[in-house]
Regions:
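Acidic, polar-rich low-complexity tracts and alpha-helical solenoid repeat scaffolds
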Residues: 1-208
Length: 208
């Protein structure tokens, strides 16, 4: 690289070096070579495209995905809202697939905090709620389930109503539990859900 800086293979070599440093989790060294490609070899289209894609991993290693999009904008590269949404959502799904609830909550919170109108807002709240419930953090879980119940006709609506009803009932909050169970009976097509909602309402009325 140093002996033949103008060789047309140098841009490819820099990309490969950047990729190697990324595999070693060395974001700073990777960035140095990737930026060199973009600054010194702007006409190497394929290598420029690869360098831009790999820079996403640089910022991911720094746990700063939003910084990646600021960087793109600073270089005059167009960023679609959907692309940014998908990139910030990907770590949430990866954490869920790995069964890592702590990381899932962290990534879902980051996603919600850094996307103005998140496309997967309901899913993020649902994943967080389930993780909190698994950890027996019921108040935190209820916050997210309740959020979902306030946005009807989503994929997790009946599940959120059911869990919110059970959590509030266990907390002796029979008034709110009754509301959740009543709505669940009205909207669910599942026999088990309807049976649970009727039973829940019966006991709520009993204790009120």
């Amino acid at each position: 690289i140093n002996d033949y800086p103008s060789n047309n293979l140098i841009s490819k070599a820099n990309v490969e070096l950047g990729s190697i440093y990324l595999k070693e989790k060395n974001a700073d060294e990777a960035e140095k070579y990737l930026i060199k490609v973009l600054d010194d070899y702007p006409d190497a289209e394929q290598e420029n495209e690869l360098a831009i894609e790999l820079m996403l991993e640089v910022y991911n290693l720094r746990n700063n995905l939003t910084g990646y999009y600021d960087w793109l904008i600073s270089r005059g590269i167009d960023v679609s809202v959907q692309e940014k949404d998908s990139s910030l959502w990907r770590p949430v799904v990866l954490a869920r697939d790995n069964g890592d609830c702590s990381n899932q909550i962290e990534k879902a919170s980051y996603y919600l905090d850094n996307i103005e109108n998140p496309i997967r807002e309901i899913s993020a709240h649902y994943f967080m709620a389930n993780c909190y419930l698994n950890d027996q953090k019921k108040n935190e879980a209820l916050f997210h389930y309740d959020f979902i119940t306030k946005k009807p006709n989503n994929n997790y609506y009946t599940e959120a109503l059911k869990y919110a009803g059970e959590i509030t009932f266990d907390a002796n909050d029979y008034k709110n539990a009754l509301a959740y169970f009543s709505t669940l009976e009205d909207v669910s097509m599942d026999e088990d859900d309807v049976s649970l909602s009727v039973k829940g309402q019966f006991y709520c009325f009993y204790y009120l």
